[in-house]
Amino acid sequence: LGWDVGYGFRPNDVVQQEARRTLLASTPEGRPLLQAEYFGAEHAHTLVWVQPQHARRSADASRGVDESALAWRGYWRQGALDLYGYGRWGRHTRASAGVAMAWVATDAWEIHASARALRHHDGWSQQASDLAAHPWQRTTLGAAMQSLVGAQWTGTEQHSVLIEYWHDGTTLSDDHWQDWNRRNAALAHPAATGLPAPARAGLLAGQATPMTASSLRRNNLFVRLAWQPEAWQASLDVLWPPADGGRLVTAALQWQGDAWRLNAAWRLAGGPSQSLLAQTPVRRTLLVAATRSF
């Protein structure tokens, strides 16, 4: 049950919470939920209870997509303009609310935007200052904002250009990432910890823990070029966080037949040596896949 209007990032995807910008597109795994919907010709309202079986779980046992929550979406159509409203009440993250819009301005241009305010959110926190201890813990943090604005141009030959800029206040701040870099530098020197090399290597590997977030930096620019002639689809996209100049470049090619789908993709993470994307554990990824539907 995917909600919201963005491509690279979706602030109001409060039920499915689907991973975005994956190398291989796949059918999202459904979430256990109860749903009620009312709709008319130009409007609709949806009420969802997601993960009802987790209603009595503790916060530590129900982080992220596992949290039991009530969610609402309202939809109103006004000509070429689609308007959305969202609300969510999570068992431990409590209230959040959001709005979104998508406007088909011309035959070629579409403009979209989305924003969400959160009272609490799940995120990574550095719990220990001791270099010899693993510091990263998943916990409930305070208020945050998420927002996105984007535009897409589509040509008559099935060429398209998508540009999106988003802010994700649920990921680590620039100050936290500076502390992260300083900790990496300290762990690289034996005298700073007094630990043997294998122990320091394990602690350095643990520093990759917060890199599982969907956005590493809070502000990101995303550009995607695509071309889809009949059964083929070729794309090139770039993710660029202005804070440190890192970059994530992905080139992909897909062929879709009646029963078979073939995919090839190449992803490269890089940038200045101190940028986060240049320090990810995996910086080059090649994917080749064949999928048959039955």
PLM segments and residue spans:
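Outer membrane beta-barrel
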Residues: 1-52, 271
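Outer-envelope beta-barrel architecture signal
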Residues: 32, 41-45, 68-70, 79-83, ...
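Transmembrane beta-strand segments that form the barrel wall of outer-membrane beta-barrel proteins
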Residues: 20, 45-53, 78-91, 97-101, ...
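Detector for outer-membrane/organellar transmembrane beta-barrel domains
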Residues: 77-80, 102-238
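Residues that define the transmembrane beta-barrel architecture of outer-membrane proteins
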Residues: 28-32, 39, 66-70, 93-97, ...
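Outer-membrane beta-barrel "beta-signal"
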Residues: 223, 260-261, 266-268, 280-294
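Outer-membrane beta-barrel translocator domains and adjoining extracellular loop/strand segments
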Residues: 7-11, 57-65, 95-100, 123-131, ...
